[in-house]
Amino acid sequence: METDTPGSPERDRYIFRDGKGPNGDQPPTNWESHFGGPAWTRVPDGQWYLHMFTKEQPDWNWNNREVRDDFLTTLHFWLDHGADGFRVDVAHGLAKDLDRDDLDDYVVWCTSDQPDDGTHPVIDRDEVHEIYHEWRKVFNEYNPPAFAVAEAWVQPNRQYLYASPDDLGQIFNFEFAKKDWIRDAMHQAIEEGIASVEHSGSSATWVMSNHDVVRHATRYGLPQVPTSEYHQLAKDWVLRCVLSSWSRPFRRFF
């Protein structure tokens, strides 16, 4: 990864920190990347850069105005070329605050352990919505306005922030994708999905399947009861219910 020298404008586009230990040979935090191994990689001059996923995907420094402006240019490029909108992967992971002493106290990838007040150092910070408000202004320059949906694994009381009209406008509701073909489980997912959109004014989203879960046709056909007719009923009912409801359904096509 070529980023010039410490303190350079090029390096400031990313998140670099000095390491721990007498020689700085230990990562700045104890975090693991999403795909395993340390979330930090050391460069020859001794500093470490943050990558919440693979080392080939260094995290951007969203406090850098140049980074933000470049993304606005990219959004314009694709919308000018006919894109209808964007699925924003890991939408909760842009803004970060690493200038604190308690970083090792936080679990990075466990949603249930995340605070619900926007104070986690790297996940679902309040500042991320400043970024999306800028994006929304770009989306609204087009007629009709560009569509966007957040893939954001955040606490339920934080979901509406991503779905608000001045933000991305939609957020994936993954509860549907996590439920089995069981009456009470499906009922809970539907009721919670409808309730969650009342605060944002958005429409409900039903994620039936994506690349992280078993396809819905297979999942609803799993042998929870021993009759093939019941399995087919589950598949047909889910599609009819979801596709005819006041919502935006999402499914895996590839």
What is the meaning of each model-derived region?
Residues 1-254:
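Active-site and adjacent substrate-binding regions of carbohydrate-active enzymes
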